[in-house]
Amino acid sequence: MVSGNNVTDRPQGPDSYARIALSLADQGWCVTPDFLAPRLIGELIGEAERIWNAGGFRHAGVGRDPDLHINPEVRTDHVRWLVPQAGSDAQRLYLHALEELRQAINRELYLGLFEFEGHLAIYTPGSYYRKHLDQFRGIGLRTVTCILYLNRDWVAEDGGQLRLYTDPDEPSRYEEILPLGGQLVTFLSARFLHEVLPARRQRISITGWFRQHGGLNI
């Protein structure tokens, strides 16, 4: 169990949140190493592995109710949605850090973000997620994507990179981001196509979105 009284367990502070917000305002995306302390990442990894071993994940779908369906040509990962009221101490510390980040982004970008929704995601060897946007067609509620990686000792040979297409006018221009444990990736959900390349070992993350009430265009 993680205690927030231990300074080594605490997430990065206000300066880090402000840097992320400024990067979103400047280029629309940001990569933050060591967003959470290693001990806290270890707790989250252990939780995800226990839930997986107990059969608590399900195949991820494409679309949103009532159009949600399984499409292995698009994605083959497994997910378990977070329930904040029933979350562990480690999850609550992470969600508290995201709340601080939400406020910092609202101060800088005036986006009116009001809540976070997210899930644990596990990619088994060979799993992938093809190129896509995080906003559903005609529904602009998901506004800022946040991905926290929960992987030990990841190297390029393990695959599973996040490929973020950083220029809509240049499809060949992209960043490939290794899913390093403790690293947080944030980007504007409506702006950037992205994909997860096939993983060669189990790959774990918490993926989620800050949402708006009315789906403003940004």
Task: Indicate where each model-derived feature is located.
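Fe(II)/2-oxoglutarate oxygenase catalytic core
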Residues: 1-145, 149-184, 190-218
